[in-house]
From Swiss-Prot:
It comes from Helicobacter pylori (strain J99 / ATCC 700824). Gene3D superfamilies: 3.30.160.20, 3.30.70.1660, Release factor. The gene is prfB. It comes from the Bacteria. One of its GO terms (molecular function) is translation release factor activity, codon specific. This is Peptide chain release factor 2. The keyword Cell membrane does not apply. Belongs to the prokaryotic/mitochondrial release factor family. PANTHER family: CLASS I PEPTIDE CHAIN RELEASE FACTOR (PTHR43116:SF3), PEPTIDE CHAIN RELEASE FACTOR 2 (PTHR43116). Methylated by PrmC. Methylation increases the termination efficiency of RF2. Peptide chain release factor 2 directs the termination of translation in response to the peptide chain termination codons UGA and UAA. GO terms for cellular component: cytoplasm.
Length: 363
């Protein structure tokens, strides 16, 4: 990097910083935080528990956004000032340090951009994830299990919690399907764009001739809704099936029919849960999954972008990302059009760069 390149970078980042300020309006955030704090001083504030909870969540969000913005702006202002002084004094040591820290400065601006993008209605929610293998038997079932592990490792990296709702073992390897929740701040906001078909190309570990195989798996993401969000489900529109839990969904395979499957006739959505020994709890979890999927479907219709992928054949259409392990190694996202070479790390859950790249591309 040289003086001209760094100078252009600073101009670009300052322009982004100005645009961010126009969007988030830091002074208005400060005023809103003052208003919330005064409201919380009222002795009657906690009488309405739901309203108090929502107000407190908003306070935390605004505080975090303001703090992230201020930290970014301070770093940028300091870099601009240091750059001018170093140029005037021909201070090569300081200039070299500024060049080294340029990626960190860029990342701090991008972090605020991501915060802004994660301010949608349900972005702060937990994420319900369903993974289904495509055609291809063991190959696709193994690929589905690799994706499942990838998301679990991502959750671990972010210190998020996960909870299995339903798990069906594959016939020889992998899984026939899995549904689980990732619980953490902005989990849904980060993962919402993972909806779609994921494609794997590799030398098959199940082929004695070591041929290259292509496998597909479908990932569906929906927000975990708060209990106070009202989604009406007409009993005549659903069928409940009860069966014995099996597989890794719970190491304790029940002798009673505690697992629950719900079919919603109008949409064709099917959800199931077997993570608990209690049929009642499994039914409640399955209903929550169904409500979340119906809610997301309605939002998509309102936005005129319904993409009901659970009704589509899992194959070449609707692909969002390709993971190629042979003859070369590369992960490429169709939305951001960015290719990544650190395939092993990605499959081990290092997917933040991919998720953020898609958020920026779709902004």
């Amino acid at each position: 990097m040289d003086n001209y390149t760094y100078s252009e970078l600073l101009k670009s980042l300052q322009n982004k910083c100005d645009n961010i300020a126009l969007i988030i309006k830091p002074e208005k955030i400060k005023q809103e935080l003052e208003r919330i704090e005064k409201e919380q001083e009222d002795p009657n504030f906690w009488q309405d528990v739901l309203k108090a909870r929502d107000t407190n969540k908003e306070k935390v969000r605004l505080n975090r956004l303001l703090e992230t913005y201020q930290k970014m702006k301070n770093s940028l202002d300091e870099s601009v000032e240091l750059f001018e002084l170093a140029q005037n004094d021909s201070d090569e040591v300081t200039l070299s340090l500024l060049y080294e820290e340029a990626p960190t400065l860029e990342h701090s601006v991008q972090k605020v951009e991501i915060e802004i993008m994660l301010s949608g209605e349900n972005d702060a929610s937990n994420a319900i994830i369903t993974i289904q293998p495509g055609a291809g038997g063991t190959e696709s079932q193994d690929w589905a299990s690799i994706l499942y592990r990838m998301y679990l490792r991502w959750a671990e990296r972010k210190s998020f919690k996960s909870e299995i709702l339903d798990y069906q073992d594959g016939e020889e390897a992998g899984i026939k399907g899995v549904a689980f929740i990732i619980k953490g701040e902005n989990a849904y906001g980060y993962l919402k764009n993972e909806n779609g078909v994921h494609r794997l190309v590799r030398i098959s570990p199940f082929d004695a001739n070591a041929k290259r195989h292509t496998s597909f798996a479908s990932v569906q993401i929906s927000p975990e809704l708060d209990d106070d969000i009202d989604i009406e489900i007409d009993e005549k529109d659903v069928r409940y099936d009860y069966y014995r839990a099996s597989g890794a969904g719970g190491q304790h395979v029940n002798k009673t029919e505690s697992a629950v499957r719900i079919t919603h006739f109008p949409t064709g959505i099917v959800v199931q849960c077997q993570n608990d020994r209690s049929q009642h709890k499994n039914k409640a979890s399955a209903l929550k999954m169904l409500k979340s999927k119906l809610y997301e479907l309605e939002l998509e219709k309102q936005q005129s972008s319904a993409k009901n992928e659970e009704k589509s054949e899992i194959g070449w259409g609707h692909q969002i990302r390709s993971y190629v392990l042979a003859p070369y190694q590369q992960v490429k996202d169709a939305r951001s059009n960015i290719a990544y070479s650190n395939v092993e790390a990605i499959l081990d859950g290092d997917i933040d760069a991919i998720l953020e790249g898609v958020l920026i591309a779709k902004a």
